Structures are given as C-alpha cells and as structure tokens.
C-alpha cells in the first residue's frame, strides 16, 4: 500500500490560515479574560487562580500527550478534535455574562481550565508537526515572519475588542463580552477546519525516545536541554508572580477605561510585531541562546518600570519595551527546543518542557495572588510591592541560570552589546556577516 504524498507547501498554507484565525481568538481570550473576570466580580485571589489553575492542569495533561496521540491515531487527528472542543468551550464563555448566578467566576475558571487542557494536549503535537515541515536552518526566519503576520491579526483583534467594549459601555457590557467571545469561538471553529486540510508527515518511532519524566529529570547534570528548561521555568515563575495582575492594576487600581487598557495592550503587541523578524534573523545568525539571554534580561526589568510613573503615555513606552523583549524570549526559546531535540523525541520533550513550565507558572500565579493581597503598599498600591518582588526574582533567576546552557549549532560569535546594537539598528551584524 502506497503512503499518501505529503504536500508540505499546501500544509504550510493551511497552517498559516489556521494561525490567522487562532490569532484572532487569542487576541480576545488572552487579553480580555481578566477584564471579563473583573466584570463578573472576581477578586485578586480569584484572578490569580484564573491564571494559575488552567496552566497547571494544562501542563499536567501533557504527561498524556504521547499516549493520546497514539490512541487517537496521529497528531493531526488529535489537533482537529482538540481545537473543536476549545471552540465549544469558548462559546460557553460567551453566555456567562447573561447568567444570573453566584458561580459565574467559578464557571469561567472551569471553562478556561478545559480550554487550557485542550491547548496543553495540542501544543506538543502542533510543535512536532510544524517543525517536520521546516528545515532547522530556516526556522528562525520562518517563525519570525509567521509570528509577525499572525501577530498583526492579534493586534487587530485587541483593537476591535477594546472598541467593542468601549462602544457597548452605554448599552451593556454583558452584550459586549458575549459578542467578543462568540466571535472568538467562531474563529476557533474556522481554525479547526484549516488544520483538517493539513497533511501529516511520517513519524518514525525510536526506542530511545521512550523515557519517563523521572528519567528526564535525572539527567540534569548531563542534559543541556534540561538546564535550559530549568532556566525557563525560573523565569516563568518570577514573571507570573506579577503578570496576571497588571490588568487588575490598570482596571481596578488606576481606573483606566477599556479604551486606555486596549491602547496599552496594542503598544505591546505592535512592538512585538516589529521586533519578531529582527529577533528571528539574529537568532539564525548568532544563535537562539544569545538572543534568549539578551531578551530575557530586558524582560526581567519590566516590573521595575511600573514603579516610576502611571501616566498612560509613559506606560505605553513600558509596554513597547515589554513587547520588544518578550517577542525575543518566546521566539528564541521555541526555536531552541526545536534545535536541541531530535524529531523522534520532540513530542515528549515539548510535553515535559510544558509540564515544568506550567507548574512554575501555577506556583508564580498562585503565590502572586496571595502576596498581592498581603504585601504592604508601595507608593500607595499593594500590587506595586508585588511588581518589585517579581523584578527581584526575575533578575535573580537570570543571574543564576542564564549561562548554565549552551548553543547547539554553529553560529557567528557576538557579544551581548553587539547583539543589542544590531537588533536596534545601531551597528548591524547581519550586513557584516554577508560582506
């Protein structure tokens, strides 16, 4: 029996279209879930749990990722089913604002957990599948371009959503949130359709790729990849001490309107769009590790900037810095995983990476929710004390772990200062490397 020919070009086209609709959904679900929770009456601790519990259970679910792929019969079949389930759960969120019940926040949390678990199971399958299509030498440039393009859709989604909520202010915020999450559900259904049009390359099994989580952890001293995972988990823990609460600080403490909130989110997303291809080209040139070290240091400083001023114009600059820094972190970290792990081990290693990272995120969010209501005020606000603690922890993990792992492929040498000057355009490395 002849194996079906895999059309890589058509699969990448379908994946790109999936990314467009997924990005539209993400612009709503990732940036307006906390505003919805606050609208439904959530406390600071509940906001922390809304961020923490979905990520924890999503990460734990990834222990089952490899088994579920085998049980369903392939990565692609699993992806389609999970995406359609996600769309259905998002549709349920759309009706929550209309329900007259005391458990609306708890219902939102439960639905977000189900959505996150579906996403957690889908992550390793998608990462393994998409990297089968693209050679390692082109991944930085490709994902930089792809992320920038779908990021533009996320940006548009954030803007449209903010304008919708602002315009519904005199009508009904319940109707506004219903419209937003109903649109997100429809976009996710469309995303599932385009995933179903992709082809699945043959996936060869390797006995060496069958290793347990404990076997994975036990190789800390020998494994360069595991030391990277520990660094990433430390940075994630420190980041999520404060990350879920910036929206709370803006909407509850500073009393910003949804329009101002939207504008600040747009600044971050726009900076990320501009920076992604720059980081991608430099990652291909000097390696993902150098890009990750620089961008994670820049990201570590972000909470400290919130202590200086709360003027919206100033915070726009802070958000631009944040979007620039985090785009480098996410792109280089993902590409390092793809470079450091063989295709046969990729699903399992991505799953274990997400398990550890998800546990760190849960601990950070849960502890942040507790500390946010317990720490003494700093400059008049309790959450500013939490931001200061987060900054201190970010820098601490950076100094302890950023140099514990190394690049896995040949690259051009460059210092951190040379890389920074090149990324911002002062003294480009890319032009010199081609001379």
PLM segments and residue spans:
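Cytoplasmic membrane-interface "Motif A"-like loop-to-helix N-cap segments
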Residues: 70-85, 145, 172-173, 284-296, ...
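Helix-loop junctions at membrane interfaces in 12-TM secondary transporters
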Residues: 95-112, 307-319
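Intracellular juxtamembrane helix-capping segments at the cytosolic ends
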Residues: 120-134, 328-342
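Helix-to-loop junctions at the C-terminal end of transmembrane segments
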Residues: 61-77, 165, 274-287, 372
């Amino acid at each position: 029996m002849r194996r079906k020919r895999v059309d890589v070009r058509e699969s990448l086209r379908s994946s790109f279209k999936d990314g467009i609709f997924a990005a539209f959904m993400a612009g709503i679900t990732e940036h307006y879930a906390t505003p919805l929770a606050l609208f439904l009456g959530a406390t600071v601790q509940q906001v922390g749990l809304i961020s923490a519990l979905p990520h924890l259970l999503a990460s734990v679910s990834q222990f089952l990722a490899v088994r579920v792929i085998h049980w369903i019969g392939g990565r692609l079949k699993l992806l389609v089913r999970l995406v359609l389930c996600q769309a259905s759960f998002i549709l349920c969120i759309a009706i929550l604002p209309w329900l007259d019940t005391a458990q609306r926040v708890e219902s939102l949390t439960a639905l977000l957990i189900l959505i996150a678990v579906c996403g957690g199971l889908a992550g390793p399958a998608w990462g393994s599948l998409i990297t089968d299509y693209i050679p390692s030498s082109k991944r930085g440039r490709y994902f930089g371009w792809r992320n920038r393009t779908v990021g533009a859709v996320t940006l548009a989604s954030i803007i449209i959503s903010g304008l919708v909520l602002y315009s519904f202010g005199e009508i009904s915020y319940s109707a506004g949130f219903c419209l937003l999450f109903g649109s997100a559900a429809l976009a996710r259904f469309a995303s599932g359709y385009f995933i179903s049009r992709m082809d699945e390359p043959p996936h060869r099994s390797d006995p060496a790729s069958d290793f347990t989580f404990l076997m994975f952890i036990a190789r800390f001293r020998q494994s360069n990849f595991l030391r990277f995972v520990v660094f990433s988990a430390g940075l994630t823990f420190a980041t999520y001490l404060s990350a879920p609460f910036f929206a709370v600080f803006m909407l509850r403490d500073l009393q910003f309107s949804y329009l101002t909130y939207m504008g600040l989110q747009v600044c971050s997303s726009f900076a990320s769009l501009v920076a992604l291809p720059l980081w991608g080209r430099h990652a291909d040139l000097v390696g993902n590790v150098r890009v990750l070290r620089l961008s994670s240091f820049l990201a570590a400083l972000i909470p400290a900037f919130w202590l200086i001023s709360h003027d919206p114009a100033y915070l726009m600059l802070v958000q631009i810095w944040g979007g620039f820094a985090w785009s480098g972190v996410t792109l280089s970290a993902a590409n390092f995983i793809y470079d450091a792990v063989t295709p046969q081990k990729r699903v399992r290693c991505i799953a274990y990476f997400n398990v550890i990272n998800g546990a760190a995120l849960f601990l950070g969010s849960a502890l942040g929710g507790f500390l946010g209501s317990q720490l003494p005020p700093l400059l008049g606000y309790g959450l500013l004390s939490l931001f200061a603690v987060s900054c201190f922890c970010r820098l601490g993990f950076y100094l302890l772990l950023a140099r514990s792992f190394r690049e896995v492929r040949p690259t051009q040498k460059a210092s951190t200062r040379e890389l920074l000057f090149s990324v911002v355009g002062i003294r480009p490395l890319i032009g010199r490397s081609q001379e």
